């Protein structure tokens, strides 16, 4: 559903959607290096090399959305009004928007910290815009949960967490 909502918003064809070159994985499918605490998801960029006769052939970015189940479930337990489906939908929409913005060169993956914070606000605003325009059961508490991000930016403890390295891992994938 997240893919459909985001691709409809950005008016992406099925072919364009495939060209985003990404995958979404949950905790069961993540390696140790892909698991983080205090974040609901992270995007890791891998360099995907096509198998060709030329060893120095082209490399294409592959984005892996690493869903952090443990952090999501902790938030669901802590905040009674958060619904798992609506919360997960928000998270995946948010991460897909990041990938689209990376692919359209609207944001650099390796941007400096202050730019990443500004980008988080922009992406939260866009996520709210997309999810506000559809009827989804229990989405309002989720939008309220993230409301601070759409107004003044992240709260200080989130800034500190982001400064410690969120969304900046690069790995090579053969």
Label the predicted regions.
Residues 66-69, 95-104:
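A short mid-domain helix/strand-loop element embedded in enzyme catalytic domains
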Residues 132-174:
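Long, well-structured alpha-helical subdomains associated
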Residues 29-39, 126-129, 153-163:
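Short, charged low-complexity intrinsically disordered segments located at boundaries
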Residues 73-74, 82, 86-90, 101-129:
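Post-HEXXH active-site segment of zinc metalloproteases
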Residues 1-58:
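A metal-dependent hydrolase signature that marks the N-terminal structural subdomain at the beginning
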Residues 71-76, 118, 139-143:
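Conserved binding/catalytic microenvironments
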Residues 5, 9, 130-137:
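Solvent-exposed amphipathic alpha-helical surface segments
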Residues 38-86:
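Active-site scaffold of zinc-dependent metalloenzymes
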């Amino acid at each position: 559903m997240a893919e459909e909502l985001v691709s409809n918003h950005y008016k992406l064809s099925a072919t364009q959607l495939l060209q985003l070159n990404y995958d979404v994985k949950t905790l069961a499918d993540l390696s140790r290096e892909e698991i983080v605490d205090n974040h609901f998801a992270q995007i890791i960029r891998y360099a995907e090399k096509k198998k060709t006769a030329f060893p120095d052939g082209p490399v294409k970015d592959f984005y892996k959305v690493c869903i952090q189940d443990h952090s999501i479930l902790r938030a669901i337990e802590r905040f009674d009004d958060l619904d798992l489906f609506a919360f997960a939908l928000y998270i995946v929409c948010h991460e897909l928007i990041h990938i689209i913005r990376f692919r359209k060169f609207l944001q650099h993956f390796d941007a400096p910290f202050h730019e990443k914070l500004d980008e988080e606000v922009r992406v939260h605003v866009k996520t709210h815009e997309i999810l506000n325009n559809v009827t989804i059961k229990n989405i309002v508490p989720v939008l309220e949960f993230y409301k601070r991000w759409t107004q003044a930016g992240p709260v200080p403890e989130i800034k500190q967490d982001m400064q410690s390295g969120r969304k900046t891992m690069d790995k090579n994938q053969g």
